[in-house]
Amino acid sequence: MRVFKVTACVPSQTRIRTQRELQNTYFTKLVPYDNWFREQQRIMKMGGKIVKVELATGKPGTNTGLL
């Protein structure tokens, strides 16, 4: 199965005291090749930025933080 290992940074969902205080959340996940465009659109719509994309193999949707 072809999957992408995607590392992205998105702004946190919770609003803190002021709008200027934004915290970013970094995450890495495996995205199936067929769902790549949808995942890319989701990250961009949330105001995030894709940091790194690699080709990988494994189970889709798993958190790869411990690899």
UniProtKB/Swiss-Prot annotation:
Entries under Pfam families matching the protein: CpcD
Keyword list, A-Z: Antenna complex, Membrane, Photosynthesis, Phycobilisome, Thylakoid
GO cellular component: phycobilisome; plasma membrane-derived thylakoid membrane
Entries under SMART domains matching the protein: CpcD (SM01094)
Annotated CpcD-like domain residues: 1-56
GO BP, one annotated term: photosynthesis
Primary residence: membrane
Subcellular location: Cellular thylakoid membrane
PROSITE patterns recorded: CPCD_LIKE
SUPFAM superfamilies, per the entry: Allophycocyanin linker chain (domain)
Domain of life according to the entry: Bacteria
Function: Rod linker protein, associated with allophycocyanin. Linker polypeptides determine the state of aggregation and the location of the disk-shaped phycobiliprotein units within the phycobilisome and modulate their spectroscopic properties in order to mediate a directed and optimal energy transfer.
Similarity comment: Belongs to the phycobilisome linker protein family.
Protein name in UniProt: Phycobilisome 7.8 kDa linker polypeptide, allophycocyanin-associated, core
Species of origin: Arthrospira platensis (Spirulina platensis)
